[in-house]
Amino acid sequence: MKTRTIVIFAFLASAISFAKFSPCIGFNWATPGQYIHACYSDLPSLLGNRSIGSGAWAFSGEQPVEYPVITGLVMYLTAQLAEVTTTYYLLNAALLALLFIAVALITARIRPQFGYLLSFTPAVIASLYINWDLWAIATMMISIYWFDRKQYDLSALAIGISIATKFIPVFLIPVAIYIFYRNTNLKGAIRYLAITGGTWLAINLPVALTTPDGWWYFYKLNIERVADWGSLWYALSALGIGLANLNYLSILLLL
């Protein structure tokens, strides 16, 4: 599929998703409207409810952000550029739309026959602007792209950045190690892990040393958090089905 077509499809998907979220702009994401119109987004919500809204560093203050370092940096920098809630949302939404187009193009490079499918995914329309996860998805897809072309060092660098943006890409590491194992490339696996870990550490260490409590908050929250909206576990809990050690169970099922 031609690059122009991929870009058009991705742009249309991002525009439709923006229209889906746009009712909230009119009433400034007030409750219950943001839930009635299904346009809730972390973008404006966290600006007002976290320290970045008062100009503080993302991982300092009484209310640090519940995101890894790179996402927190994006949240902080965009807050410096746009202090008003609507402007902050629009700025971040524009960046996310560009990232989505980039992700669609990378997907097409990895599997050309599937290049258009991403833009027609209902989940994209429903949740494109709900948070900053596309920053991690973009670098994750770059990592997959380089790995597919056997550029393992670049892939490891990209996945290290991705994990420092959102932790879920860490689950690609066992897949990569298995591929190295299948190809009897132990040295390659060790090098891949070393570059990934070194990249993640280089990004995280300055923040962990200077604002340790704020840095740890993301990990602490996800270890302790209960079933949240939008999850199967929340639906089960609403039906009276409680599950102990839910976070550990989720990790095991994902693996």
Give the positions of each predicted feature.
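Membrane-interface alpha helices of multi-pass inner-membrane proteins
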Residues: A123-A126, S143-I144, D153-Y178
